[in-house]
């Protein structure tokens, strides 16, 4: 188990390092494809989530979904009937499709989406909902015929998905001067706490290490998240790597 954890940790840091040098969406596509295959996935997609009156076309960022499936999904406007997308709007934790939908009663249209996805070997998957503090919603999904992920694998995929999404949003913005001006002011103590979070420590553990109260550490973490416009710790770590706050 320790060797597995070490291997996954090395994979994550290699991915973060190589992604930092990515010059285009194609570079990210290649790297993300390798990560997907490592964890047993055949397909992946990164997309924003449109409002109820919008279509997905302009929100889709990157992916290798089967052309046949994506065309059908887009033409039938399945995004608003997709139970995975619906679930991602209401939670901020990653989930395996089969586990999350196990006790769900799907309506006819939602069941149709999942049944038709199976025709393209999208039988199960793993999705990472991503929300910004400003309310923008996105989702990163991995698809396969079968999903087998350890807790360590899930955490790693969450972090890499959040990082890739953040990186792609920055590339789409493509305004270096604005990004430099918008770089948040992070204190030495905040940077230290981000490092501990990236090392897998909980707020309680960090409080013990630094000799501070649990509430104090929680408040610092929440303040960092506000500065980075993210809503949870994995996104905070990913954005900190992208902005070179930590390396």
From Swiss-Prot:
Organism of derivation: Rhizobium leguminosarum bv. viciae
For this protein, the DNA-binding region equals 203-222
Tell me the InterPro entries matching this sequence. Sig_transdc_resp-reg_C-effctor (IPR016032), TF_LuxR_autoind-bd_dom (IPR005143), TF_LuxR_autoind-bd_dom_sf (IPR036693), Tscrpt_reg_LuxR_C (IPR000792), WH-like_DNA-bd_sf (IPR036388)
**Which keywords describe this protein according to UniProt?**
Activator, DNA-binding, Plasmid, Transcription, Transcription regulation
Domain of life here?
Bacteria
The cross-references to CDD domains, in alphabetical order and at most eight, read: LuxR_C_like
Q: Which GO terms describe its molecular function?
A: DNA binding
Tell me which residues make up the HTH luxR-type domain: 179-244
The protein's role, per its UniProt record: Positive regulator of the rhiABC operon.
What's the protein here called? Regulatory protein RhiR
Protein's GO biological process: regulation of DNA-templated transcription
């Amino acid at each position: 188990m320790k060797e597995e954890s070490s291997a996954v940790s090395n994979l994550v840091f290699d991915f973060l390092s190589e992604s930092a040098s990515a010059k285009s969406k194609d570079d990210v596509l290649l790297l993300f494809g390798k990560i997907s295959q490592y964890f047993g996935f055949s397909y992946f997609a990164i997309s924003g989530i449109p409002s109820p009156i919008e279509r997905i076309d302009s929100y889709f960022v990157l992916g290798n979904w089967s052309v046949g499936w994506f065309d059908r999904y887009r033409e039938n406007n399945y995004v608003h009937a997709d139970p995975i997308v619906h679930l991602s709007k209401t939670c901020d934790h990653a989930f395996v499709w089969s586990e999350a939908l196990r006790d769900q009663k799907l309506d006819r249209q939602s069941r149709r989406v999942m049944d038709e996805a199976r025709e393209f070997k999208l039988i199960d998957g793993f999705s990472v909902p991503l929300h910004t503090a400003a309310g923008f919603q996105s989702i990163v999904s991995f698809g396969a015929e079968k999903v087998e992920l350890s807790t360590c694998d899930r955490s790693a995929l969450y972090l890499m998905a959040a990082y890739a999404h953040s990186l792609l949003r920055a590339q789409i913005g493509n305004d270096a001067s604005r990004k430099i001006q918008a770089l948040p002011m992070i204190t030495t103590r905040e940077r230290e706490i981000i490092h501990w979070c990236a090392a897998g420590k909980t707020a309680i553990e960090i409080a013990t290490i630094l000799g501070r109260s649990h509430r104090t550490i929680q408040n610092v973490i929440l303040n960092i998240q506000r500065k980075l416009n993210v809503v949870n710790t994995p996104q905070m770590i990913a954005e900190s790597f992208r902005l070179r706050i930590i390396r």
